[in-house]
C-alpha cells in the first residue's frame, strides 16, 4: 500500500521544503506505519547546517516522525486533511539521538500507536538508517478542526 507524494498531500498540509516524508511503504490502521525519507545534499537545511560537514538537524528528524505519525492518525480515523482537520504536535518525550544523518542516507521512519483517545494519539517512533538506530522518541499529536 505505498503512498507517494500524490497521495500524501491528502493527509499532510506540508509542502516543499517542509514535507519531510517521501512515501509510506506500510501501514496497519490503528496500529503502526512505516515511511521513507531520502536525504539529499539538495535539502535547504544543509545550506546552514553545516556547509562544510552537512548533518540533518535533529529537530527535523523529530518532525519526520511527527509527519509519519500524522498520516497514521488520519488513516486510523478514516479522515484526510481535506475533511477539515489537522494533526498538530502536542508533545515530544524521550528523544534520543544515536547517529548522524548525512546526505545520501535513507531514513526508515516507524511509528506505533501506544495510546489513542478522542483524537489525541501517543506514538513510539524510531528512525533507522539501514539497520542502525538514528533517533527515537515518543510523539503526541492532537486532531484539530481547521
From Swiss-Prot:
InterPro entries: FabA_FabZ, FabZ, HotDog_dom_sf. It comes from the Bacteria. It holds the Pfam family FabA. The active site is at residue 49. Gene3D superfamilies: Hotdog Thioesterase (3.10.129.10). It catalyses: a (3R)-hydroxyacyl-[ACP] = a (2E)-enoyl-[ACP] + H2O. CDD domains: FabZ. The keyword Cytoplasm applies. NCBIfam families: fabZ (TIGR01750), PRK00006.1 (NF000582). Belongs to the thioester dehydratase family. FabZ subfamily. Involved in unsaturated fatty acids biosynthesis. Catalyzes the dehydration of short chain beta-hydroxyacyl-ACPs and long chain saturated and unsaturated beta-hydroxyacyl-ACPs. This is 3-hydroxyacyl-[acyl-carrier-protein] dehydratase FabZ. It comes from Psychrobacter arcticus (strain DSM 17307 / VKM B-2377 / 273-4).
Amino acid at each position: 500500500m505505498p503512498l507517494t507524494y500524490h497521495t500524501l498531500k491528502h493527509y499532510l498540509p506540508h509542502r516543499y521544503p517542509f514535507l519531510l516524508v517521501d512515501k509510506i511503504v506500510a501501514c496497519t490502521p490503528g496500529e503502526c506505519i512505516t515511511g521513507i525519507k531520502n536525504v539529499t545534499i539538495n535539502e535547504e537545511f544543509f545550506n546552514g547546517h553545516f556547509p562544510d560537514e552537512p548533518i540533518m538537524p535533529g529537530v527535523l528528524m523529530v518532525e519526520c516522525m511527527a509527519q509519519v505519525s500524522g498520516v497514521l492518525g488520519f488513516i486510523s480515523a478514516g479522515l484526510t486533511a481535506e475533511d477539515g482537520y489537522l494533526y498538530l504536535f502536542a508533545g515530544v518525550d524521550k528523544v534520543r539521538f544515536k547517529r548522524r544523518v548525512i546526505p545520501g542516507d535513507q531514513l526508515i521512519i516507524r511509528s506505533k500507536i501506544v495510546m489513542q483517545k478522542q483524537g489525541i494519539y501517543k506514538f513510539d517512533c524510531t528512525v533507522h538508517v539501514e539497520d542502525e538506530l538514528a533517533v527515537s522518541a515518543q510523539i503526541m499529536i492532537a486532531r484539530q478542526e481547521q
